């Protein structure tokens, strides 16, 4: 179910304050966050935000196409290494 429009997008307060403080400065700073559930808002465009996936911080460069998505969508927590090969195909 989608979030109500009257509530607005969810963004963690500390992350929002970091975005606003880096918005005014010309220095390119990577913002680290654990908040995977925060929504990407238009103020974040052209910033680099590192999202924690449980092991490392994965840097994400925010573009206009990403607005409205959650930060956690772009930092996968599981690694798929493929299915095991079965040797039964060759034997008969």
Curated annotation (Swiss-Prot):
This is Small ribosomal subunit protein uS19. GO terms for biological process: ribosomal small subunit assembly; translation. One of its GO terms (cellular component) is cytoplasm. It comes from the Bacteria. Keywords: Ribonucleoprotein, Ribosomal protein, RNA-binding, rRNA-binding. GO terms for molecular function: rRNA binding; structural constituent of ribosome. It comes from Borreliella burgdorferi (strain ATCC 35210 / DSM 4680 / CIP 102532 / B31). Protein S19 forms a complex with S13 that binds strongly to the 16S ribosomal RNA. Belongs to the universal ribosomal protein uS19 family. InterPro entries: Ribosomal_uS19 (IPR002222), Ribosomal_uS19_bac-type (IPR005732), Ribosomal_uS19_CS (IPR020934), Ribosomal_uS19_SF (IPR023575). Transmembrane segments: none annotated.
